[in-house]
Amino acid sequence: MIKIDSKIPEGPVAEKWTNYKAHQKLVNPANKRRLDIIVVGTGLAGASAAASLGEMGFRVFNFCIQDSPRRAHSIAAQGGINAAKNYQNDGDSVYRLFYDTVKGGDYRAREANVYRLAEVSNAIIDQCVAQGVPFAREYGGTLDNRSFGGAQVSRTFYAKGQTGQQLLLGAYSALSRQVNVGTVKLYTRYEMQDVVIVDGRARGIIAKNLVTGELERFAAHAVVIATGGYGNAYFLSTNAMGCNCTAAISCYRKGAVFANPAYVQIHPTCIPVHGDQQSKLTLMSESLRNDGRIWVPKKKEDAVKLQKGEIKGSDIPEEDRDYYLERRYPAFGNLVPRDVASRAAKERCDAGFGVNNTGLAVFLDFSEAINRLGIDVVLQRYGNLFDMYEEITDVNPGELAKEISGVKYYNPMMIYPAIHYTMGGIWVDYELQTTIKGLFAIGECNFSDHGANRLGASALMQGLADGYFVLPYTIQNYLADQITVPRFSTDLPEFAEAEKAVQAKIDKFMSIQGKESVDSIHKKLGHVMWEYVGMGRTAEGLKKGIAELKEIRKEFETNLFIPGSKEGMNVELDKAIRLYDFITMGELVAYDALNRNESCGGHFREEYQTEEGEAKRDDENFFYVACWEYQGDDEKAPILIKEPLVYEAIKVQTRNYKS
């Protein structure tokens, strides 16, 4: 069994990061030029890390699955990025951000990592402003803020509804500068297939050229994985179609333990599924919950009429509307954390109060905000989001629909929860290093900062914190002992064996020649994952899900059809490789969910809930990080290793968003 060591520094939580930086090992400028680092991924975490490491003088090889880093899924983030600047003078602080993040994660995050995240958050904003990121500003010129779920202060910095795009352009500009000066070599249209281990350390990768189809070897003194989450294991999610977990799973198979895979975030404000031919879902920013109010009809007969298309939401007067989040959680209202809002929407729809033809939707209404602020102000805040919603649904949320008794009602949006983010990921210690020496994981692909539920606007914060301000310190602590190690040759037998194994897998997939397409099997996988490993989980359902996942694996191995050949570009082959890893990932999520006999954050076991239907934790038996060690892709279940959680600065208690 693999032994894990979180390497959390001694001392008070507020001093750990400062003390770490004061005593860590450093690499001098001359030696940095002799050290090579591979960074896999060019989203916010990967681009910021590659740019920072290049700026420091290391030689960096950066791998991008797309034609350009500007196409990373980070670009889709809409609402904002958190930081504890307290510009609004509303009581925010580093400690408050730290506390809200731990509480939002249902007390299942590593305390020391979360405090460090809150501590460096302010530097992220300064860095991005210096890069020219056009954050929204007040009339007087100071940076503006808005609120997000799980907080009672305004700490979210934003660039209209395109924050991820603007932050990515900032990171991309920094990366481009390093590419231009020669410290970073960028490889576009390459996808990592395996990590190469030499004498127990990560020393390189095998990557597939997605244009030529060829496998290539790359060597370095350290490898950094920044490839995002595994939400597409569910087939339908808000993730970009190319998002996958192949790099992470390849590390898992080589000995990097995987932490808390059951912690999957389901976002409450997504455009509902419109048919069985859909391949992706669209997120509507959490920022909309600042001014939008979520409701369903009070009367079931009104819900039935809505489902039949006999009436519209604007036909229902104020007194017949149930603003259920405001009713249940008066202290936070519509800005409760995502897991709470998602379960509440599911409960209302399961009770028969859904508002579309499938019964799986609730309303997000801006009538009150438009009447209070005026349409111009609302459009200034959310105009591009309104446009996006109208383009997809042909409904304009800013259009007056009806006036009842002098009250103006506008077209409400329809929303429903969907898979969005994964809090689980590759296990890392305080230094962001995995259980494989020299292999680091940053951003969404590690588990470190969000516990069982991520707060809105904290994904961008973590990605940039890891890339700009954490990894550049911690990786030196490892590389300081590698300065006498010469550059590696890719002719080493370990590289040849890794490439041979990847090629054998590709040959095996191409030789199946069955009848089912990749997308067909992926849809079946997604159905099983959503049905049994989705918002509501039970022991019986999870056991059934695991059994069905094994059948899906067998179908993949015996009945998959991949057109074309392995030479040259073959998109279906690339998708098949990713799907095989999604199946492994799905089993891992299900095993973890079955083991965790409690409800916490995004993991909700229906057997473990309070009388009010809230998540019921079991701190006595499950106050730990669940780390899973790979045992094979056959019938063997992974081995559980526990990292006990230690809280020194925060009292662990039941989450309360009602008062």
Task: Briefly describe each language-model feature range.
Residues 250, 256-399, 473-476:
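An anion/pyrophosphate-binding glycine-rich loop and adjacent beta-alpha core
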Residues 124-214, 226, 270-284, 289:
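Conserved redox-cofactor binding core of oxidoreductases
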Residues 67-99, 265-269, 276-280:
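Conserved N-terminal glycine-rich FAD pyrophosphate-binding loop of Rossmann-like flavoproteins
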Residues 41-44:
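Glycine-rich Rossmann-fold phosphate-binding loop(s) that bind the pyrophosphate
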Residues 222-277, 281, 450-473:
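Glycine-rich loop(s) and the adjacent beta-strand/alpha-helix scaffold that form part
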Residues 58-64, 259-260:
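Short beta-strand "acidic-cap" motif of Rossmann-like dinucleotide-binding folds
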Residues 15, 19, 24-27, 31-36, ...:
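Glycine- and aromatic-enriched mobile tails/lids
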Residues 33-35, 213-222, 435:
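Core beta-strand elements of the Rossmann-like FAD/NAD(P) dinucleotide-binding domain
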